[in-house]
Amino acid sequence: MNGAAYLSIIRPVNAVVAGLAGILASIIATGSIPAEFFWIFCIVLTITGAGNVINDYYDKEIDAINQPDRPIPSGQIIPGHALMYAILLFLIGNGIAILFTPLPLAGIAMGNSVILWLYASFLKKTPLIGNISVSYLAASIFLFGGAIQGTQGIISVFPIAGATWGVMLARELIKDAEDMPGDNEHGARTFPLLYGIRATIYLALISATAGVLMSLLLYSRWGAFYLGAIILVDAIILFGAIRGMKATNSEEMIKAKSSKILKAGMFASLLVFLLSAVLL
């Protein structure tokens, strides 16, 4: 058994960062470091790792061409063993959630596990639904944080999750618009390839606007300081979404740097959420 291969296939850096993001989300949701922070880290890390493994399992034919050095196509891990490894990691992550955290958090963990499996197996190839799935998984990290306080906690962080989902979906769509030539060459069925770059940009703007509106709902929770800070961040996000409006092809979309601006806006909003949760 190649231990290094089994470690690398979970994308350890990616999984650890996701686990730390889970702790950060719980701080934003509760205003302090919860007693269950270690379990949150373990749950997010193992389920993220499982998602990475199952993704490699279903992508093994593509990776044999594009990423032949990865553990499965290189022969370091047998596909069947990778499948069992993914199942084991999913069971560990969900087992920890069931045993050591509130039921709502365990429910989210199980739901996310199902979505990760469905995404790897076929949703990633489904126009828009795949984008929605990825965006939800990113936003659900805040639902994890809120779920520490039960159902009421989930409700309290819903605007944060909604704002993250909206902006993340906008960025996913814009990235697909940037990647149209490569996706077309590989036979992908992305939203921009099916419905055109203009429809994609308009949908991204609508999604980003929805995210911005959701972020404003938190004014009642954190007050005027938060509102002033988030309006500045929201302006960056809307600027990023609008900046690509004149693009007629992928090259112009890349030059507009919309996805990079949206990414900067997302990181800035995360900082505002964190400071508001801790200080206000």
Curated annotation (Swiss-Prot):
Catalytic activity: sn-3-O-(geranylgeranyl)glycerol 1-phosphate + (2E,6E,10E)-geranylgeranyl diphosphate = 2,3-bis-O-(geranylgeranyl)-sn-glycerol 1-phosphate + diphosphate
GO terms under biological process: glycerophospholipid biosynthetic process
A single GO molecular function term of this UniProt record: magnesium ion binding
Keyword Nucleotide-binding: no
Membrane-traversing stretches: 4-24, 27-47, 83-103, 104-124, 128-148, 150-170, 199-219, 222-242, 260-280
Highest taxon listed in the record's lineage: Archaea
Main subcellular location of this protein, as a coarse class: membrane
Pfam family, one: UbiA
GO cellular component: plasma membrane
Keywords: Cell membrane, Lipid biosynthesis, Lipid metabolism, Magnesium, Membrane, Phospholipid biosynthesis, Phospholipid metabolism, Transferase, Transmembrane, Transmembrane helix
Location within or outside the cell: Cell membrane
Cofactor(s) the record lists: Mg(2+)
Family, similarity comment: Belongs to the UbiA prenyltransferase family. DGGGP synthase subfamily.
Functional summary from the UniProt entry: Prenyltransferase that catalyzes the transfer of the geranylgeranyl moiety of geranylgeranyl diphosphate (GGPP) to the C2 hydroxyl of (S)-3-O-geranylgeranylglyceryl phosphate (GGGP). This reaction is the second ether-bond-formation step in the biosynthesis of archaeal membrane lipids.
Descriptive protein name: Digeranylgeranylglyceryl phosphate synthase
Record lineage: Archaea, Methanobacteriati, Methanobacteriota, Stenosarchaea group, Methanomicrobia
